[in-house]
């Protein structure tokens, strides 16, 4: 394990593997650097890249200086990029894609960007969480009820059936890992900034996010995620859409399908 100090003094923990251009992996809600699929993806990509797999603020071995603000997470990513030599490729998954996108918007030196199924809602008919989703998630954590926060976030935010959450509670190790990062769920909700509730994607992204971008969707994914990926690819000026079976993230990341696609994108014209 390595660590870097973010602008506000928070320690951000990361693992580094491989040799080649720097590539930073940004996990989504409930993810952390020891999440099995994230470890697998880092390993597969390490053949071509120096992969930085980090614990986002509040997770794993990273610190959690309060109060939280989205800009702090952007600074964390900037600190990692500085540690990696001043520029890097970045892959972001789900809410991690939202973080990577917002970092690029703020001018963080990301040379290529892969956005993997950001959970924006872009069509009226798509499933939306309740309008008070962020507030209610935060209230449950503030009231020291992480189990309720997990169930609420998964069922109302991610659209998971209640029985799936129930099954997770009885799987050894799974529930305890979820409880350990539950307090960061309001951070993910804040990162999504209303876009999960149907807020329109800003036209300003055409001018502020010009880096080569790969937007990824799985053809088996829910319609709302596919609509989001397609809308985002159409919004960003230098984006391409990758749409294939097996690239979804709502069940289990198929790292052996995802890694060659990421390698081809990041290594093109290198």
Spans of model-derived segments:
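Conserved HGGG/HGGXW glycine-rich cap/lid loop of the alpha/beta-hydrolase fold
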Residues: 3-63
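Conserved catalytic-core motifs of eukaryotic protein kinase domains, centered on the activation segment
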Residues: 35-37, 62-67, 125, 226
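Active-site loop/oxyanion-hole signature of alpha/beta-hydrolase fold enzymes
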Residues: 43, 52-89, 260
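Short beta-to-alpha linker loops that shape the active-site pocket of alpha/beta-hydrolase fold enzymes
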Residues: 55-59, 119, 245-248
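Conserved hydrolase catalytic core segment
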Residues: 87-124
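Helix-rich cap/lid subdomain of alpha/beta-hydrolase
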Residues: 118, 122-175, 188-189
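Conserved serine/cysteine hydrolase catalytic core
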Residues: 177-234, 243
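Catalytic active-site module of serine/aspartate enzymes centered on a nucleophile-bearing elbow/loop
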Residues: 238-270
